[in-house]
Amino acid sequence: MSVACVLKRKAVLWQDSFSPHLKQHAQDTANPNMPVVLTSGTGSQAQPQPAANQALAAGTHSSPVPGSIGVAGRSQDDAMVDYFFQRQHGEQLGGGGSGGGGYNNSKHRWPTGDNIHAEHQVRSMDELNHDFQALALEGRAMGEQLLPGKKFWESDDSSKDGPKGIFLGDQWRDSAWGTSDHSVSQPIMVQRRPGQGFHVNSEVNSVLSPRSESGGLGVSMVEYVLSSSPGDSCLRKGGFGPRDAENDENDKGDKKNKGTFDGDKLGDLKEEGDVMDKTNGLPVQNGIDTDVKDFSRTPGNCQNSASEVDLLGPNQNGSEGLAQLASTNGAKPVEDFSNIESQSVPLDPMEHVGMEPLQFDYSGTQVPVDSAAATVGLFDYNSQQQLFQRPNALAVQQLTAAQQQQYALAAAHQPHIAGLAPAAFVPNPYIISAAPPGTDPYAAGLAAAATLGPAVVPHQYYGVTPWGVYPASLFQQQAAAAAAATNSANQQTTQQTQQGQQQVLRGGASQRPLTPNQNQQGQQTDPLVAAAAVNSALAFGQGLAAGMPGYPVLAPAAYYDQTGALVVNAGARNGLGAPVRLVAPAPVIISSSAAQAAVAAAAASANGAAGGLAGTTNGPFRPLGTQQPQPQPQQQPTNNLASSSFYGNNSLSSNSQSSSLFSQGSAQPANTSLGFGSSSSLGATLGSALGGFGTAVANSNTGSGSRRDSLTGSSDLYKRTSSSLTPIGHSFYNGLGFSSSPGPVGMPLPSQGPGHSQTPPPSLSSHGSSSSLNLGGLTNGSGRYISAAPGAEAKYRSASSASSLFSPSSTLFPSSRLRYGMSDVMPSGRSRLLEDFRNNRYPNLQLREIAGHIMEFSQDQHGSRFIQLKLERATPAERQLVFNEILQAAYQLMVDVFGNYVIQKFFEFGSLEQKLALAERIRGHVLSLALQMYGCRVIQKALEFIPPDQQVINEMVRELDGHVLKCVKDQNGNHVVQKCIECVQPQSLQFIIDAFKGQVFALSTHPYGCRVIQRILEHCLPEQTLPILEELHQHTEQLVQDQYGNYVIQHVLEHGRPEDKSKIVAEIRGNVLVLSQHKFASNVVEKCVTHASRTERAMLIDEVCTMNDGPHSALYTMMKDQYANYVVQKMIDVAEPAQRKIVMHKIRPHIATLRKYTYGKHILAKLEKYYMKNGVDLGPICGPPNGII
């Protein structure tokens, strides 16, 4: 096995070259699984203590002085590194690619899975993998990437072959782990070689960590500490004492490339902004103070400044330092961390990265992790939360760093799990189904999602919080691996503890984001750590190793080859194996009430472990208490190692084999966890039950529970209440409660406060049916993408928490079409269902399929039209379905620009009961609705389609009493009054007639009032219209010349009684010539000629023919007039033959002149038509040439 040489910083232990006897001594002095802690000085010595603490003391908190370690410079031969690499059994010569090359060639700190093994011979495959990376870094220097043992520092001239940073290229010029574009001060992403972890001839789950014992830890230590240290500059500096800045003047340029941290260089840096801003050749972007800015991010850099050591004290071991830095249970006030900004604490003597601790706003009291003996927390967060309780604003760079802390957390312990062959594990931690090579990766994911559960995103696509990448086969792998590994796991407990402690990413009293369990490390909870390591390996199989309680990592067993085909578990492959942390480092809390309700609902709807929701101990969900659980005493991890909790924060007793997702407090029995028993099928469990992995919990305001609310930003739209959890299994998303993502790629937006955590977005398919792999989106049964947008749980935050974990039908499998919720809000504000409908993704959508969305559809232009069309042909049951949803919010729809049409359709096609129910909703709001643009239409429809004998109609109309004139003069209300006059029995409208008394002339000249007067004249009783007509006759002369009043007079002439017509004609007589030339009155004269009696008509025509207008007759004047010519035309049409002949003879002398006038031509055209039709010969129409008659 690999032997880690963990070095204390008290003495120079390695000479300028590799010493074979020293290496041999390291092998001889340690067990195969124990790290060789070589130390001298007053620090914590390598005593025969539990190996985990041994590694912790040496690798976590020891603070080597500048120059104490890392003597070997660039002059060191790479073959020496390979010589050390050969210490790993089953490892090829170039295996250093996992240890040295893993760091050296890994250009990304993202979980890209590239350049992690020694198999760099296939360059095209390496480049292909990098092309898959969404965050592919440019400037790749393949020639240097292929070096299995790349050094980080150059003692000699760096111009010999360019910068020697592992991120070869202009992206990070000199730094071993330089700042990336996306993240500053990220934890190193120690990536695993699939040849070591997933494939045959190798040890299981070999993921390298800077302080992990196995999987090439010794290789990484030797590679980065010995052969990559700044060589002679380290030897120049001794002890913890500060060194003069003058010593650095000569190699000040080198320091920028070396990225070393020199104790006194702090003084220079504070004066020298040039150096202060350059940590590894690039500016430090995370706002770290000058002391921290010079903090080298190079994992091989073992030099910590005296200022770093002083934080812990020269003689303080790592565990004590951690306890001092962060109180054991996270209760240390934030004030104790005030110096974090200006001081840096050694996180790992092998690796120093100056970085602000992430500020995940976890409450002051951290819930202890599940006892590693009983449940291995895939998300075991010990009470190390205070490291994330920084008040500083959380930067995106720091967030990314925290997201990648898990990458080094991989399989240091894995080779020690009984040395299980990969066959002992379910080989596919990603939900990339074991499809043959050449299969489309996304199509291959369909079957996997159907059987293994949530659709996942291959980690190459998203290096930040791999959304949806959950170990679907978590419990299945656990079952398979537990039996095979029980004996060996017991045997490996001690070693496992050591490696588990070592591989904590940056364990120790560092001020950088730490694994939340390092406090437990300080508390000497080695057996728990060992159990966590063993159980995690058992649970995750070869690719899922969360060796330390803390970040879950998910390493893929499949990759894409050069052709883009999916290769599953097909041997060691270059570019694969980067362990992926699944969720941000915090327990996901489920409120106890919601969890208990879900337990009850599950028990009612499922049958035992196979049914899926019995309160078994092996449950994927576990309610989380908000009290501060007390840390459990150490437990021997050899009792039950088959448990693996997703979000374990419970110290379970060693006899509880709970496989839970959400563990409650230590006092909570394990059998209260929700979910499936160990014998249940995880395909259905993870497919439907685990849809809401990141379901944020409502108890965001509790002072003690760990805070997991992913939406605690300032946006009210995305704020959750603190009352309840989104009920898992309500009627949307097939009963899966999803929480939204705080940022674009799982990162908090810059505007979001420190309270933001990283809840993965719901990229899980909730179907047991086919579901393609998708990037952060949900898919419904037909494979369509259904993205759960922010605020997806808003609708159901106050819903009953007793809902089933699954859909209301209590079935594990959803219906053919996904049930959308109103909470599935898109950025446009529309739900995903409506958005899909608007985009024609549902051409055959039915009313029953939009249940729960009727209100939203009704208020959308296209959705409203859809409902209107469906309602016309809907069955009574379908209409009732729609009606039930709109009734409570009927008024809201009545005043909506599109919703009012849906209400109107119900008045048209609904049953009488539905119409009356809606009418009751109108009652009390008739006036406001009548004056509203859309509400007035609804009232008109109600008045039109509700039988007039219904009492509700009369009651509605009476609400207008006292407001008649206001409504009549309103552009909307006048339509309501007109409809009332048309549809309501006249006896009920007397209040309208009364309101018009004395106002007839004013209303008749009003643009809206004139319409109401006409309706009254049409529909009201004679006794009701008489007073109106009386007022009209008194003002006929004015009304006929009014732009609106003339319509009232015309209406009387058309529909009025003969006596009323005669009165009007009498007013016109004697004024025909004048009124005929009036724009408005000419219309009245036309109507008089048309509707008057024969005698009256003859009198009017004669008046025109006999009257003279100056030298010409009135007829000639009228024929030339733009308005009066229409009166003449009408007279010709309606005159009796004898009178028409007279008119013709009167017109004939003016024919030649009429041709000069535009309007006169109308008269001539009328005459020609008439005479041609009747064959009457009046002689030549054309006059003499001179136009004189």
Curated annotation (Swiss-Prot):
Q: What is its main location?
A: cytoplasm
What are the boundaries of the region Disordered?
Answer: 24-65, 233-288, 491-525, 614-652, 743-774
What InterPro entries does this protein map onto?
ARM-like, ARM-type_fold, PUM-HD, Pumilio_RNA-bd, Pumilio_RNA-bd_rpt
Non-specific-nucleotide binding in RNA target: annotated segments = 974-978
Tell me which tissues or organs this protein is expressed in.
Detected in embryonic male and female gonads, heart, liver and muscle. Detected in adult brain, testis, ovary, heart, lung, spleen, kidney and muscle.
Low complexity composition-biased segments: 45-58, 491-503, 627-652, 764-774
Q: What ranges cover the Pumilio repeats?
A: 849-884, 885-920, 921-958, 959-994, 995-1030, 1031-1066, 1067-1102, 1106-1145
Query: Does the keyword Cytoplasm belong to this entry?
Result: yes
Q: Where is this region: Adenine-nucleotide binding in RNA target?
A: 864-868, 936-940, 1010-1014
Q: Which GO terms describe its biological process?
A: adult locomotory behavior; miRNA processing; mRNA destabilization; positive regulation of miRNA-mediated gene silencing; post-transcriptional gene silencing; regulation of cell cycle; regulation of mRNA stability; regulation of translation
Residue ranges, compositional bias (Basic and acidic residues): 250-277
Which locations, inside or outside the cell, does it occupy?
Answer: Cytoplasm; Cytoplasm, P-body; Cytoplasmic granule
Q: What is known of its domains?
A: The pumilio repeats mediate the association with RNA by packing together to form a right-handed superhelix that approximates a half donut. RNA-binding occurs on the concave side of the surface. PUM1 is composed of 8 pumilio repeats of 36 residues; each repeat binds a single nucleotide in its RNA target. Residues at positions 12 and 16 of the pumilio repeat bind each RNA base via hydrogen bonding or van der Waals contacts with the Watson-Crick edge, while the amino acid at position 13 makes a stacking interaction.
Name of the protein this chain belongs to = Pumilio homolog 1
Species this chain originates from: Gallus gallus
